[in-house]
């Protein structure tokens, strides 16, 4: 009688019955209605519940629901994380579920160790076999299997429960060479299913973003050929080349019922496209052909469209040819094909190609409803008329209703980033410590930002940090924590770290200028505590800014555990500007390399994809450069790289350039104020073609001279570097004849909109400055004549050659100062001596846009030697005062609390001057004359500076 009861209940539960009547019936027959609804609903979903199944209590709640479900055909575990215990207990509960048909088990192991996953996979595979179920759909996407899980994955794919499989989705598993295992497993499964009398008839296979490359693709193709039943093959973003494409083409031919082919973002090249075109006539049911970003070029595209005419055109719905270097030479053939009456129903994507100046006319002729040219600004030969959105999705990856399913959508969402112009302004005006990547939500605590920016908090004890801890604890969601402009002690750091443990959602740590006035040995324990807290919480950090914290090499050691932990696998922005790293740069590089290794081992989306690396003013020198080179060669993902003012010589520069060659998305490269020299510039110039997205190149103050500047301009190509915005060649001893030549060559960029700007101010134009400036168009910046360094005479050229070209030259400030002293002593002529002193003072003032703290003190201390050598000549003194005042104004613009930046400047100078009675922790070796420094301070005080430090100055530098 139970079935009759169900029939009686059905009309009562119908949506057409009023809510009041339905509720009354439910109240009267609650048990029967519950049973009936569970029977109709064949799906049990835990999707997005973010369950962390560790304890038996948590696991039992899930198991109870599995056991109570009367007709469990679909089990959806997406977005939860299973421990080994959970996997085994859930597997046990599935052994009786013979009716199970679909297992949606993607994103099921977040935060689990790689040796835990195979144990769960083994248990679940055994359970499916024991249950006797016959699955039609298996989705294991977004689980970081990697190559290390080959055995367990192979065994799982041998289960008789998969003989009936129709849909297999293995998207974003980090398979790599484990793709060969999947191919072999499928071949074995095909053979076993045939022997069992139920041959496998797989219809859909999805395996995107898995680094399959050639070997794994060939293995999978062998399985596809044996199958012959596939209707949908999706293998986007797998680095497939040459032989892999050829193998796939043959596999396509053997699967006559193919409807969807998606090999977006692989390397077909013209040869591969031609191979694919030759099999299209065998595929009469094809609906979607996605060859976006496959570098097919004109010949490959022409071959494809020629063969499309031979298929069943009524079936064809969409063709994606975006990002294939298609030129206007073939646009008429493409238009004629897809605008024809028999093909005008087909949606065609040809955006992000190379139509250039013909874009508008081509679109006018052929851009009818079915052909999508995309935005004009997306064309590879044009520049957008409006600011391009950072991280915009490639049009070729857009999904629509007929080719999208919940199993196959590939998420390409990116974090919002600030416009490049805003970041550039911060860089040039405030220095890196003031630079922030904006977030539209950052001012709202409800949207994830907790900020104590410039609150001038002096947090020494746990009690003093209590207000901060309370705010952190009260935040329901804290994705960003900004502590810049405060000072943190050990006790306060520990309690704040403890508060972080309750915020696993933390992504952005904006912690620059956090240790003002602290001792060096205080900083590492705080860094370690904060890092440990984030690791304990399971944070996935995307941005870490520790700039302007003078922690030195010991700070780099303190960051080791954090940078090598899973919490840093997600790191996209790392800013370590002005930290005094020195040899600690090698440790940072080593930690990033280890982080990359571990993340790759875990697999999938866990791979470290660092985009921004800023480590200017850290005295990295050549050893640090070589260490970083090894790291960034392996990373391949950096977009913003800055190591300005690090004393890196030509050899180190060449190593960095060779490494960055592998980072094809590089947009910003800052090597300013290192010793690149012409040879280094030549090596860099030859690498420029590797960076088609380059926007800013800064080689100011790099001593690359005429030859180096010429190399750079010659190798910048308007056809290739379409995104270029600024090139800085300032302060490189560029002479007028070569400057005029470069201005002429720069006109090759006149076709770009907007035109990129070439900066060549602060060079050696001398009396010909007006001539050079007169030649310069609006997109060439020669600066003001007052900034020009004047003509190079023979003696100066020789001096610069000796001090800069020698492969053994040591750029340490101490040695450089000694060399210059020696050079001054051999000059007898008073006028020459004054000229050289003035030149040295001018050089200290070159492009002083972002130096502060120790750097500012170093420059003022270095003013002592040239002033003393010319016996404080009035012209030299006035010029030195101008330089010093420029520095002080910069320092005054930097707001620091509780100790003002100007006070820090005075403290550093006092400690480095003999006779003050203050002993420096480290002697910088300038030997500054206290009388000269005293005179400078007197003049600066007279001009209204150092009001807060007046008593300090009177004590250590009494007026002369």
From Swiss-Prot:
Q: Which InterPro entries match?
A: Leu-rich_rpt, LRR_dom_sf, RanGap
Q: A single GO CC term, please?
A: cytosol
- Its main localization is nucleus
A Gene Ontology molecular function term of the record: small GTPase binding
LRR repeats, residue ranges: 69-92, 132-156, 162-185, 227-254, 313-340, 475-498, 538-561, 568-595, 663-685
CDD domains cross-referenced by the UniProt entry:
LRR_RI
Q: Where is this region: Disordered?
A: 370-408, 777-819
Segments of skewed composition (Acidic residues) = 380-401, 783-798, 806-819
Kindly list the biological process annotations in GO that this record carries: cell division; embryo development ending in birth or egg hatching; nuclear export
Matches recorded under Gene3D superfamilies:
Ribonuclease Inhibitor
Q: Has UniProt tagged this entry with the keyword Repeat?
A: yes
Where's it found, cell-wise? Answer: Nucleus
Instruction: Please provide the record's keywords in A-Z order.
Output: Cell cycle, Cell division, GTPase activation, Leucine-rich repeat, Mitosis, Nucleus, Repeat
Purpose: GTPase system comprising ran-1, ran-2 and ran-3 is essential in nucleocytoplasmic trafficking. Ran-2 is a GTPase activator for the nuclear RAS-related regulatory protein Ran, converting it to the putatively inactive GDP-bound state. Required for correct chromosome alignment and segregation on the metaphase plate.
Q: What is this protein called?
A: Ran GTPase-activating protein 2
């Amino acid at each position: 009688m139970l079935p009759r009861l169900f029939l009686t209940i059905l009309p009562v539960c119908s949506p057409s019955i009023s809510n009041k009547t339905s509720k009354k019936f439910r109240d009267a027959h609650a048990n029967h209605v519950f049973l009936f609804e569970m029977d109709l609903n064949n799906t049990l979903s835990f999707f997005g519940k973010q369950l962390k199944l560790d304890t038996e209590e948590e696991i039992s709640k899930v198991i109870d629901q599995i056991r109570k479900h009367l007709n469990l055909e679909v089990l959806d575990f997406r977005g939860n994380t299973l421990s080994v215990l959970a996997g085994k207990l859930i597997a046990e509960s599935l052994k009786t579920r013979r009716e199970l048909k679909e297992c949606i088990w993607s994103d099921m192991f977040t935060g689990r160790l790689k040796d835990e996953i195979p144990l769960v996979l083994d248990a679940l595979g055994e359970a499916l076999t024991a249950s006797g179920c016959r699955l039609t759909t298996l989705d294991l996407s977004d689980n970081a299997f990697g190559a290390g899980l080959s055995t367990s994955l192979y065994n799982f794919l041998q289960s008789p429960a998969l003989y009936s499989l129709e849909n297999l989705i293995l998207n974003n598993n980090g398979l790599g060479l484990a793709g060969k295992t999947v191919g072999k497993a499928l071949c074995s499964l095909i053979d076993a299913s045939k022997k069992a009398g139920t041959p496998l008839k797989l219809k859909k296979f999805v395996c995107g973003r898995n680094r399959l490359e050639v070997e794994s693709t060939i293995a999978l193709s062998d399985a596809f050929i044996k199958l012959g039943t596939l209707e949908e093959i999706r293998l986007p973003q797998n680095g497939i080349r040459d032989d892999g494409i050829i193998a796939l083409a043959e596999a396509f031919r053997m699967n006559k019922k193919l409807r969807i082919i998606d090999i977006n973002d692989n390397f077909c090249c013209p040869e591969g496209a031609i191979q694919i075109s030759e099999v299209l006539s065998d595929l009469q049911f094809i609906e979607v052909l996605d060859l976006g970003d496959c570098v097919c070029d004109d010949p490959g595209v022409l071959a494809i469209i020629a063969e499309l005419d031979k298929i069943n055109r009524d079936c064809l719905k969409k063709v994606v040819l975006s990002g294939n270097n298609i030129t206007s030479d073939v646009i008429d053939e493409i238009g004629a094909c897809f605008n024809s009456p028999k093909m005008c129903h087909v949606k065609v994507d040809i955006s992000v190609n190379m139509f250039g100046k013909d874009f508008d006319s081509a679109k006018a002729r052929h851009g009818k409803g079915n052909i999508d040219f995309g935005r004009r600004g997306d064309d590879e030969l044009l520049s957008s008329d409006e600011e391009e959105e950072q991280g915009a999705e490639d049009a070729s990856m857009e999904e629509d209703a007929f080719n999208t399913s919940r199993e196959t959508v590939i998420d390409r969402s990116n974090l919002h980033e600030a416009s490049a112009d805003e970041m550039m302004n911060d860089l040039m005006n405030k220095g890196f410590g003031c630079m922030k990547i904006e977030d539209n939500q950052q001012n709202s605590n409800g949207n994830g930002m907790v900020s104590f920016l410039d609150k001038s908090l002096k947090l020494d004890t746990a009690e003093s940090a209590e207000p901060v801890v309370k705010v952190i604890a009260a935040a329901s969601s804290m994705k960003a924590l900004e502590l810049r402009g405060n000072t943190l002690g050990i006790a306060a750091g520990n309690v704040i770290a403890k508060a972080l443990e309750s915020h696993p959602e933390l992504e952005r740590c904006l912690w620059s200028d956090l240790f003002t006035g602290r001792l060096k040995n205080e900083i590492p324990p705080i860094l370690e505590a904060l890092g440990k807290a984030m690791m304990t919480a399971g944070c996935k950090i995307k941005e870490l800014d520790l700039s302007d914290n003078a922690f030195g090499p010991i700070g780099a050691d303190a960051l080791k555990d954090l940078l090598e932990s899973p919490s840093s696998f997600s790191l996209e922005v790392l800013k370590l500007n002005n930290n005094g790293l020195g040899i600690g740069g090698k440790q940072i590089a080593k930690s990033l390399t280890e982080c990359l290794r571990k993340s790759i081992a875990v697999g999938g989306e866990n791979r470290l994809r660092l985009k921004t690396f800023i480590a200017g003013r850290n005295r990295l020198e050549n050893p640090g450069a070589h260490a970083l080179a090894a790291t960034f060669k392996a990373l391949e993902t950096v977009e913003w790289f800055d190591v300005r003012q690090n004393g890196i010589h030509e050899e180190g520069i060449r190593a960095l350039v060779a490494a960055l060659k592998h980072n094809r998305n590089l947009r910003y490269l800052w090597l300013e104020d290192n010793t690149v020299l012409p040879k280094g510039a030549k090596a860099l110039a030859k690498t420029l073609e590797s960076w088609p997205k380059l926007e800013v190149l800064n080689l100011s103050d790099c001593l690359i001279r005429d030859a180096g500047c010429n190399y750079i301009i010659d190798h910048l190509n308007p056809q290739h570097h379409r995104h270029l915005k600024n090139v800085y060649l300032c302060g490189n001893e560029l002479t007028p004849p070569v400057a005029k030549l470069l201005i002429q060559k720069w006109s090759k960029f006149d076709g770009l909109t907007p035109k990129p700007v070439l900066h060549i101010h602060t060079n050696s134009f001398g009396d010909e400055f007006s001539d050079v400036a007169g030649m310069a168009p609006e997109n060439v910046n020669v600066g003001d004549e007052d900034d020009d360094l004047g003509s190079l005479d023979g003696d100066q050229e020789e001096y610069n050659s000796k001090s800069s070209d020698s492969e053994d030259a040591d750029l340490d400030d101490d040695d450089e100062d000694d060399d210059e002293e020696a050079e001054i002593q051999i000059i007898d002529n008073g006028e020459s001596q004054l000229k050289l002193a003035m030149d040295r003072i001018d050089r200290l003032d070159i492009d002083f846009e972002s130096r502060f703290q120790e750097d500012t003190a170093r420059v003022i201390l270095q003013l002592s030697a040239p002033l003393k050598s010319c016996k404080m000549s009035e012209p030299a003194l006035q010029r030195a005062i101008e330089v010093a005042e420029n520095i002080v104004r910069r320092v005054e613009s930097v707001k620091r609390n509780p100790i003002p930046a100007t006070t820090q400047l005075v403290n550093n100078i006092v400690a480095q001057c003999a006779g003050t009675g203050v002993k420096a922790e480290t002697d910088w070796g300038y030997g500054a004359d206290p009388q000269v420094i005293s005179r400078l301070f007197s003049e600066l005080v007279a001009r209204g500076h150092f009001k807060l430090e007046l008593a300090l100055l009177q004590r250590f530098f009494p007026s002369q």
